[in-house]
Amino acid sequence: MNSPQYTDSNYSEDEGLEDYKIDGYHPVHVGEILLDRYVIMQKLGYGHFSTAWLALDNNNGNYVAIKVQKSDERYIQGAYDEIEILQALAKKNFDKEWINSLREYYKDDKEKLNELETVEHTQVVQLLNCFIHNGQNGKHFCMVFEVMGVTLLEIIKRYNYKGIPLPLVRIITKQILIGLDFLHRICHIIHTDLKP
């Protein structure tokens, strides 16, 4: 299996070193193995609460994205809340009402229609695993996700902030609206943090 290609241009800033301390970020490095299973391949990005890494799952040969939370206790509760929501979403992937909605959404796309019974088409990221990693800066909650594509912000940057071609806007908008429909109508969850 080929590794997904993510270049250093996928993120132009770094999180700085000041938060690599007790209760802060874990200093993940390429080649590090987490949970005796996930081999870190490269950095995907970071946020205020965590860093994100591309990893190879040695159990099945698949690539995954791992979010490594800061170790401060305040962030642990947020991680538990996120996991609770993601697990609730996973239970609804094959909801009969949702599958019928997808048939309607993709009625003109025979390839998608054939996949509906076997593949999750929620347009919402899927949690694959979670664990605690004991690192030099504390205990870090880690969440393992399926690997997704680039962010909307990266697409905007690729077009030099001059607008995205309309056909691509249509595809992205449809995916976002399908994901929001799944969250709102099927899962009764309101997403309050949409951003590129």
For the regions a language model picked out, list residue spans one by one.
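Conserved alphaE helix
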Residues: 139-142, 147-196
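Conserved protein-kinase N-lobe ATP-binding Lys motif
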Residues: 67-75, 90
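Glycine-rich ATP phosphate-binding loop
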Residues: 30, 51-70
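AlphaC helix of the eukaryotic protein kinase fold
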Residues: 80-87
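Juxta-kinase regulatory segment immediately upstream of eukaryotic protein kinase catalytic domains
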Residues: 1-33
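Protein kinase glycine-rich loop
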Residues: 40-48, 52
